[in-house]
């Protein structure tokens, strides 16, 4: 299901499309090159299509751009899930990048929650304060209704961050894939 959303505030203007049944076609332009690189890796390795154009108040800092991208992407994921009929719902990925390792486990069953374990050594990563990566995933998970457990270790901050985004993308792509076994909602409650 291809979802297109737009959101405009006094801080950001975002146009985004998300297709979990895509082929990994990506066109991302947030005005923050490192964030673009992370989102591109997430979508390409997750096998879903993502286009995202953001104009944000980067003269202030990157917080609003990153947070609002998480809001809109989360809303798009939630819309794509819909009732959840036929999706796998659960998935995980363990991804290395040289000395770094990222582990992501997801439940796309309508309950937004984030457990985030890992630290970066640098004060900025691609001119982004590292706490904004946790905030991005928190915002995305709350808006998408996804429970995510994210863990990462390593020595190189770039590698840790990239492995984390790729692992999230792979797990998301697998969780949203149609199971092929049933068209039912994957819940004993019968609903998310």
Curated annotation (Swiss-Prot):
UniProt cross-references to Gene3D superfamilies, sorted A to Z: Imidazole glycerol phosphate dehydratase, domain 1
Q: Which SUPFAM superfamilies match?
A: Ribosomal protein S5 domain 2-like (SSF54211)
Q: Does the keyword Lyase apply?
A: yes
UniProt GO cellular component terms: cytoplasm
Q: What is its main location?
A: cytoplasm
Where in or outside the cell it occurs: the entry states: Cytoplasm
Substrates-to-products reaction catalysed: D-erythro-1-(imidazol-4-yl)glycerol 3-phosphate = 3-(imidazol-4-yl)-2-oxopropyl phosphate + H2O
Its signal peptide is none
CDD domains with a match to the protein in the record: IGPD
Please give the biological process terms from Gene Ontology that the record holds: L-histidine biosynthetic process
Named in its record, the pathway it takes part in is: Amino-acid biosynthesis; L-histidine biosynthesis; L-histidine from 5-phospho-alpha-D-ribose 1-diphosphate: step 6/9
Task: Give the enzyme's main class according to its UniProt record, as a single word.
Answer: lyase
Q: Which PANTHER family match?
A: IMIDAZOLEGLYCEROL-PHOSPHATE DEHYDRATASE (PTHR23133:SF2), IMIDAZOLEGLYCEROL-PHOSPHATE DEHYDRATASE HIS7 (PTHR23133)
Q: What family classification does the UniProt entry report for this protein?
A: Belongs to the imidazoleglycerol-phosphate dehydratase family.
Q: What is this protein's record name?
A: Imidazoleglycerol-phosphate dehydratase
Which species is this record about?
A: Methanoregula boonei (strain DSM 21154 / JCM 14090 / 6A8)
């Amino acid at each position: 299901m291809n979802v297109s959303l737009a959101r405009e505030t006094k801080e950001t203007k975002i146009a985004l499309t998300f297709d979990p049944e895509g082929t990994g076609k990506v066109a991302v332009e947030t005005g923050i090159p490192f964030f673009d690189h992370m989102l591109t890796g997430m979508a390409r390795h997750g096998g879903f299509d993502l286009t995202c154009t953001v104009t944000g108040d980067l003269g202030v800092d990157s917080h609003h751009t990153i947070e609002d991208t998480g809001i809109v992407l989360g809303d798009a994921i939630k819309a794509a899930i819909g009732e959840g009929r036929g999706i796998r719902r659960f998935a995980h990925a363990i991804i290395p990048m040289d000395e770094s390792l990222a582990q992501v486990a997801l439940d796309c069953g309508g309950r937004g929650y984030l457990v985030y374990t890992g630290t970066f050594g640098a004060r900025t990563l691609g001119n982004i304060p590292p706490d904004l990566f946790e905030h991005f995933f928190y915002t995305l998970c709350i808006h998408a209704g996804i429970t995510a457990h994210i863990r990462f270790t390593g020595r190189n901050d770039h590698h840790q961050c990239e492995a984390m985004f790729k692992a999230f993308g792979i797990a998301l792509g697998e969780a949203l894939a149609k199971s092929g076994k049933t068209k039912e909602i994957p819940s004993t409650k019968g609903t998310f």
